[in-house]
Amino acid sequence: MALVLQLLPLLLSKVQGNPEVSLEGNPGDRVNLSCIGVSDPTRWAWAPSFPACKGLSKGRRPILWASSSGTPTVLQHFSGRLRSLDTGIKRLELLLSAGDSGTFFCKGRQENESRTVIQVLGDKAGCRPSGSTHGSEYSKVLIPLLGFGLVLGLGALGLVWWRRSCVPPSHIAPVINAEPQRPLEQDSKISGHLDQEPNLHYADLDHSVLRRHRRMSALVPGDASTVYAVVV
């Protein structure tokens, strides 16, 4: 009974020609749009309730135009889901999709219009297109990982620089100036001087002692015992 009371205003609006109708449905349902009170409709427009769900801006946008050929022109967004049920565009059938919630306007030649408000169950203000949702989730994970990796890299570079600055420089071996090798002639001269060292001892004897010995030998008689003095 309660359900009948809720649907009664909708049924009465269709019978009485109320210019504004409200409909609800799930994605995949088919709903009928009718121009109520408009005798000669020329186009349909749509103002989405949640433009972000379809990546659109706010405001009205035309979705279908009457054509002289009899085949109406449908906006790409509703292509394959919106079709006319008669020779004109007075009655349409729409296959609902997520994000279709909004107000559909039927405009006539005298700029009179009727409105049909459609609420797709599940639509909400925070919805996003599925592609952008996956992209946003991927970016939410990727950006922190990149930031964490950058911090780790900078930390490692800083640690290496700090260790290098704290460690004293390695011991450098003192530079030894190698003496030039002496020629063979100098070596032979040095060896010759070493061989002559015993003769130098005799050459360096104190001659005053020898002279004193001679004087003593002159004063001592010949028969006196000879005294030899060896000076080393």
From Swiss-Prot:
| Ranges annotated as spanning the membrane | 141-161
Mostly located where? membrane
**Record-level Gene Ontology MF annotations:** heparin binding
Its signal peptide is 1-17
Question: What are the alphabetically sorted keywords of the record?
Answer: Cell membrane, Glycoprotein, Heparin-binding, Membrane, Phosphoprotein, Receptor, Signal, Transmembrane, Transmembrane helix
Report what the Swiss-Prot or TrEMBL entry states about this protein's PTMs. N-glycosylated.
Q: Where in the cell is it found?
A: Cell membrane
Ranges in the topological domain labelled Cytoplasmic: 162-232
Q: Does the keyword Transmembrane helix apply?
A: yes
Q: Give the record's glycosylation annotations as residue positions.
A: N32, N112
Q: Offer one example of a GO biological process linked to this entry.
A: erythrocyte differentiation
A Pfam family found in this protein is G6B
Fetch the InterPro entries from UniProt.
G6B, G6B_V-set
The chain residues annotated with the modification Phosphotyrosine are: Y202
Where is the short sequence motif ITIM motif located? 200-205, 226-231
Q: Does the keyword Cytoplasm apply?
A: no
Q: How the protein assembles, per its UniProt entry? A: Interacts (via ITIM motif) with PTPN6 and PTPN11. Binds to heparin.
Functional note? Inhibitory receptor that acts as a critical regulator of hematopoietic lineage differentiation, megakaryocyte function and platelet production. Inhibits platelet aggregation and activation by agonists such as ADP and collagen-related peptide. This regulation of megakaryocate function as well as platelet production ann activation is done through the inhibition (via the 2 ITIM motifs) of the receptors CLEC1B and GP6:FcRgamma signaling. Appears to operate in a calcium-independent manner.
How does the entry describe the domains?
Contains both a transmembrane region and 2 copies of a cytoplasmic motif that is referred to as the immunoreceptor tyrosine-based inhibitor motif (ITIM). This motif is involved in modulation of cellular responses. The phosphorylated ITIM motif can bind the SH2 domain of several SH2-containing phosphatases. The 2 ITIM motifs of isoform B are required for the inhibition of CLEC1B and GP6:FCER1G signaling and platelet activation.
Put simply, this protein is called: Megakaryocyte and platelet inhibitory receptor G6b
Source organism of the structure: Rattus norvegicus
Q: Which gene encodes it?
A: Mpig6b
